[in-house]
C-alpha cells in the first residue's frame, strides 16, 4: 500500500488575496508589499484579485486580517509589517500579540494567513529582510500563502 501525500501547488491563478499592511515603519513595509506583489504576479495572480488593506500598526493587523478573512472576498491573507526593538518592553508586547492574533485568525476562520511581519533588533536587520541581504520576507509570505491556498483546496 502506498501512502498518499498531498501538497499545495505554487500557482496563484484564480485565487483572491488580501494584503493587510501596517503603516508603521512604512518605508520598509512598502518593500515587503512590493515583494509580496512580485511573488503573486510571478505565480499567476491578477492585480484584480488582490486588495491591500492598510492599518496603523502591527497591533491592528489581526483585527483587519480577521475582517478580511471573514468577508468571503479572499482565499488568503498576507499580513505584512515591521516591528523594530526599541529601549522599552513595547516591542515584546506588540510582537507577541500580533503573532498570536494572526495565528488565531487563521485557526478561527480556516483561511490561510501568512506571517510577513518583521520582528528585528534594529533598522539594519529590517532593511536586510525587506529585499537586500536576506531576501524579501514579503515575497516569502506570499509564497507560503499560495501553497496553503492550494493545499486547503484539496481537503
From Swiss-Prot:
Keywords associated with the record: Riboflavin biosynthesis, Transferase
Similarity comment: family membership: Belongs to the DMRL synthase family.
Which organism is the protein's source? Chlorobium phaeobacteroides (strain DSM 266 / SMG 266 / 2430)
User: From the UniProt record, which GO molecular function terms apply?
Assistant: 6,7-dimethyl-8-ribityllumazine synthase activity
A GO biological-process term = riboflavin biosynthetic process
- Superkingdom as given in the UniProt entry: Bacteria
Q: What is this protein called?
A: 6,7-dimethyl-8-ribityllumazine synthase
Q: Specify the pathway.
A: Cofactor biosynthesis; riboflavin biosynthesis; riboflavin from 2-hydroxy-3-oxobutyl phosphate and 5-amino-6-(D-ribitylamino)uracil: step 1/2
Q: What sort of enzyme, by top EC class, is this?
A: transferase
Amino acid at each position: 500500500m502506498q501512502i498518499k501525500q498531498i501538497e499545495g501547488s505554487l500557482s496563484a491563478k484564480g485565487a483572491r488575496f488580501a494584503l493587510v499592511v501596517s503603516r508603521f515603519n512604512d518605508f520598509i513595509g512598502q518593500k515587503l508589499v512590493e515583494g509580496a506583489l512580485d511573488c503573486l504576479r510571478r505565480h499567476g495572480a491578477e492585480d484584480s484579485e488582490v486588495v491591500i488593506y492598510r492599518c496603523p500598526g502591527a497591533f491592528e493587523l489581526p483585527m483587519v486580517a480577521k475582517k478580511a478573512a471573514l468577508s468571503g472576498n479572499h482565499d488568503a491573507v498576507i499580513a505584512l509589517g515591521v516591528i523594530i526593538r526599541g529601549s522599552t518592553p513595547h516591542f515584546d508586547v506588540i510582537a507577541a500579540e500580533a503573532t498570536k492574533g494572526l495565528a488565531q485568525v487563521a485557526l478561527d476562520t480556516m483561511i490561510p494567513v501568512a506571517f510577513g511581519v518583521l520582528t528585528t533588533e534594529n533598522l539594519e536587520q529590517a532593511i536586510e529582510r525587506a529585499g537586500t541581504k536576506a531576501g524579501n520576507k514579503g515575497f516569502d509570505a506570499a509564497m507560503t500563502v499560495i501553497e496553503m491556498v492550494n493545499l486547503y483546496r484539496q481537503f
